[in-house]
């Protein structure tokens, strides 16, 4: 069983605890190829490409220029600790025990516009490059063209190594589009998290993103190995709603957001 999540734009660049291991990228050479092309952009190009303010464009231009691979280990940080958006606030990996981080290293994968597919403890450098960015590159018109079937092939390899045929999709549509579903050797289950509002259950983006991280945390804390056990997920008041769910779309609801 593998869980898939999106990365985050917000980053925590404070140093990670030294005792937490750092692992190597699967797609380091591909990331370098992509970054070599991104380095050709000036600050104005970065602003236009990524729809950023001048300040953020300057920051990311500088990140591109400073990026070198292989990394200097002192400057890289584990992906799951670097990202700090809503999903990662729910996951709160920094408070997990070693056994729980080990579970995530086996079962959690992070999709990335620059790095393709990350294990949680892969050391990476700070960056911003969303998967939906329309960046013309040597392989085509955008990042979906750049990554092609590489991400899907690696997922298939890692699922086979686990002897599993189940993928839990906790990623956004923008990122999951980088996975070629028809070529994935897995059953895909997509949890949805809905809150009661104005007389009906609705997906509220902030809460849903946080809940995706909470579900990954729940799986790690409880060392979940059977997919059906995810239906017992109950963090932050969510409960599985069988009447709203289908075989592949599992809906979790709660009456009141915290």
Swiss-Prot record:
GO cellular component terms, semicolon-separated? cytosol
Biological process GO terms, please? response to hydroperoxide
Q: Sorted alphabetically, which Pfam families does this protein's record hold? A: H2O2_YaaD
Checking HAMAP family in the record gives: UPF0246
Q: Which family does it belong to?
A: Belongs to the UPF0246 family.
- Name the chain's protein: UPF0246 protein Tcr_1650
């Amino acid at each position: 069983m593998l869980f898939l999540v999106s990365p985050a734009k917000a980053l925590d660049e404070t140093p990670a605890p030294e005792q937490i291991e750092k692992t190597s990228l699967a797609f380091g050479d591909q990331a370098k190829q992509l970054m070599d092309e991104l380095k050709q952009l000036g600050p104005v190009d970065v602003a236009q490409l990524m729809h950023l303010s001048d300040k953020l464009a300057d920051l990311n231009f500088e990140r591109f220029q400073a990026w070198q691979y292989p990394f200097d280990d002192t400057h890289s940080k584990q992906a799951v600790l670097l990202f700090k958006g809503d999903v990662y606030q729910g996951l709160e990996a920094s408070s997990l025990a070693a056994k729980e981080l080990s579970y995530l290293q086996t079962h959690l994968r992070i999709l990335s516009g620059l790095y393709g597919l990350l294990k949680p403890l892969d050391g990476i450098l700070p960056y911003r490059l969303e998967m939906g960015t329309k960046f013309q590159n040597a392989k085509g018109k955008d990042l979906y063209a750049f990554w092609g079937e590489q991400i899907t092939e690696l997922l298939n390899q890692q699922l086979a190594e686990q002897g599993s045929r189940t993928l839990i999709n906790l990623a956004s549509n923008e990122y999951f589009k980088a996975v070629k579903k028809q070529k994935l050797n897995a059953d895909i289950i997509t949890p949805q998290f809905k809150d009661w509002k104005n007389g009906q259950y609705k997906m509220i983006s902030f809460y849903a993103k946080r809940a995706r991280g909470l579900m990954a945390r729940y799986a790690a804390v409880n060392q979940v190995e059977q997919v059906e056990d995810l239906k017992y997920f109950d963090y932050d008041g969510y409960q599985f709603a069988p009447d709203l769910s289908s075989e592949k779309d599992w809906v979790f609801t709660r009456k009141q957001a915290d």
